[in-house]
């Protein structure tokens, strides 16, 4: 967790947990051969917050510890944010800690979370709604953040603080149950402890195992993504995994990579009942013929381009057209309602051809079709060549999105 010679930034609110952490790291810093700096952020949520800041500064002077302080008007940021006050405060606090660590040259940021914090977070997530991996919520070490006290209960930290006369201030809002975290701490956890006095230890073991599970899932998903996920301009496509949980996690990974957010599991599970589910405005998950498309899968744009050169590229397709006829002109467009193609004297609806050849639904409106001056469909890439397309006109499909031509590069003629 800590290595010799490291500089550690200690997040200090002034409360008993963080003050005890600062006391312990100061006491053992000569033995560990580490340098420590304290960091305190005034959120301006309480009238007494200035008192806390002055207290931290005074104790740090007494203990000869460098301290970095700042203040942010969190209530102002909270207005119209759509988030809870606790969420905004947390975001602001972590941003402050990261910036301060960079400023002072600290390689680690120490936080005073303990087993009771872990228990409260698990209960909070269960109430709010979370997936199984959401229980892997607070880890002893993640990126630059470390939590040396995570193996201790709040009662153990408080007992140590009393024995060593660690100074601290009391945040009066910690007892206000209008805040979700406090309600859990003062109303729900005591009931849980009536059923199991060591519930903190039980949850700690659960979360520890869940961290191992999450690490395994993350490696599995990363391996799948590297081998199977293809990103295009505004969507991604991959082979649908046979395992439902892997499908959910890969889809969530892709969405987070593309949009920085993930939907609830329930919405993704909905894709198993409906082939297309809209997650957010214009953002879909669509399953078709063994492939999954994520993103802006619904293609509404209409295009029509005259063929003037040999090569054309559009919507992930690359085609080559060699027109040896001076008396004919050709265009490339995407499909429209009622399109048909005649092959070997038989007229077929283009829609039926796509279904027969198992072209995923999310590609059908993107496919570049070769048409003549009468707007007749003469060629469908990799699928069909019309009787009306002269033999001395060469057309080739050179590149196409993954899964468009299933199982090969060219189908037999329909």
Swiss-Prot record:
Its EC number is 6.3.4.19. One of its GO terms (molecular function) is tRNA(Ile)-lysidine synthase activity. Signal peptide: none annotated. The keyword tRNA processing applies. It is found in: Cytoplasm. ATP binds at residues 13-18. Keywords: ATP-binding, Cytoplasm, Ligase, Nucleotide-binding, tRNA processing. It is an enzyme of class 6 (ligase). GO terms for cellular component: cytoplasm. The keyword Chaperone does not apply. It catalyses: cytidine(34) in tRNA(Ile2) + L-lysine + ATP = lysidine(34) in tRNA(Ile2) + AMP + diphosphate + H(+). GO terms for biological process: tRNA modification. Ligates lysine onto the cytidine present at position 34 of the AUA codon-specific tRNA(Ile) that contains the anticodon CAU, in an ATP-dependent manner. Cytidine is converted to lysidine, thus changing the amino acid specificity of the tRNA from methionine to isoleucine. Belongs to the tRNA(Ile)-lysidine synthase family. The N-terminal region contains the highly conserved SGGXDS motif, predicted to be a P-loop motif involved in ATP binding. This is tRNA(Ile)-lysidine synthase. It comes from Thermotoga maritima (strain ATCC 43589 / DSM 3109 / JCM 10099 / NBRC 100826 / MSB8). The lineage of its organism: Bacteria, Thermotogati, Thermotogota, Thermotogae, Thermotogales.
């Amino acid at each position: 967790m800590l290595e010799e010679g490291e500089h550690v930034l200690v997040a200090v609110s002034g409360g008993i947990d963080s003050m005890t952490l600062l006391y312990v790291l100061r006491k053992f810093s000569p033995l560990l051969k580490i340098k420590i700096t304290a960091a305190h952020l005034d959120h301006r949520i309480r009238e007494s917050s200035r008192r806390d800041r002055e207290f931290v500064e005074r104790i740090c002077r007494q203990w000869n510890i460098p301290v970095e302080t700042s203040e942010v008007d969190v209530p102002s940021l909270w207005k119209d944010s759509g988030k809870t006050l606790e969420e905004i405060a947390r975001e602001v606090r972590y941003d402050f800690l990261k910036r301060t660590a960079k400023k002072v040259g600290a390689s680690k940021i120490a936080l005073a979370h303990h087993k009771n914090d872990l228990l409260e977070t698990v209960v909070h997530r269960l109430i709010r709604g979370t997936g199984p991996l959401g229980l892997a919520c607070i880890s002893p070490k993640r990126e630059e953040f470390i939590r040396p006290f995570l193996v201790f209960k709040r009662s153990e930290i408080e007992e140590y603080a009393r024995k060593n006369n660690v100074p601290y201030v009391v945040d009066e809002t910690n007892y206000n149950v209008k805040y979700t975290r406090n309600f859990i701490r003062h109303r729900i956890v005591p009931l849980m402890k009536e059923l199991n006095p060591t519930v903190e230890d039980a949850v700690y073991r659960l979360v520890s195992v869940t961290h191992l599970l999450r690490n395994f899932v993350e490696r599995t998903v990363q391996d799948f993504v590297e081998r199977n996920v293809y990103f295009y301009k505004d969507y991604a496509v991959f082979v649908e995994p046979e395992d439902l949980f892997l499908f959910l996690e890969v889809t969530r990974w892709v969405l987070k990579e593309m949009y920085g957010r993930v939907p609830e599991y329930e919405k993704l599970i909905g894709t198993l009942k409906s082939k297309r589910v809209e997650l957010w405005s214009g953002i879909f998950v669509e399953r078709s013929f063994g492939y999954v498309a994520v993103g802006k899968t619904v293609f509404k744009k209409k295009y029509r381009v005259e063929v003037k050169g040999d090569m054309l590229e559009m919507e992930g397709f690359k085609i080559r057209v060699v027109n040896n006829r001076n008396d004919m002109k050709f265009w490339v467009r995407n499909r429209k309602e009622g399109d048909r193609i005649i092959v070997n004297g038989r007229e077929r609806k283009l829609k039926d051809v796509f279904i027969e050849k198992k072209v995923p639904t999310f590609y059908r409106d993107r496919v570049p079709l070769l048409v003549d001056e009468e707007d007749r469909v003469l060629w469908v890439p990799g699928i069909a060549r019309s009787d009306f397309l002269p033999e001395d006109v060469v057309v080739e499909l050179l590149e196409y999105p993954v899964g468009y031509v299933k199982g090969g590069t060219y189908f037999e003629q329909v």
